[in-house]
């Protein structure tokens, strides 16, 4: 029986060094040193990227995706997502972005299963026509197809999905551990940018959305 590991973060997780599998499929050749340092022999490594579902490579036209979510096709669209539980300083960043968001740009915030956050944001932005608050989104791929910029925490799968769609990213509030390594990998390779504070993150997002 052959066994393998498919790494879904851009680092060698601590438990990998305790394993003895036939193959280790890793996100990038540049990460080989991390796995070799963990005791994995070179012949067992295969650099092949992180697999994502086909829907994240479907290539739906951005205009059609925007129509599906009620976003005007001539508007720039920022999608803000912080995991299925809606973690991170979303409220602080959202307030700063919404305050300076031009009328021809839209912000969609996905709260996931965080009902308290959904309620707070819905009340805060009630009546703001270009700020849209959503709870759990089933067709996340279609929403990402509608986006011109993606504001997210650096989870291994979610950032790979965005990268496969060639979607520009701004990172929010990485959780200590694997997400820090994911963040560092994408910042180093030019796949994303970030800021040190909610103010910096909001300012960077607005500049990118306006192509400044």
PLM feature segments, named:
Residues 1-9:
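Active-site proximal beta-strand in glycosyltransferases
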Residues 10-23:
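Membrane-proximal helix-turn-helix segments that form the acceptor-binding/catalytic region
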Residues 11-13, 117, 138-142, 158, ...:
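Short acidic active-site motifs
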Residues 22-84, 113-116:
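A nucleotide-sugar donor-handling region in carbohydrate enzymes
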Residues 62-147:
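Donor-nucleotide binding loops and adjacent catalytic segments primarily
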Residues 140-181:
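A donor-sugar binding/catalytic signature common to diverse glycosyltransferases
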Residues 187-190, 196-211:
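C-terminal "capping" alpha-helix adjacent to the active site of nucleotide-linked donor transferases
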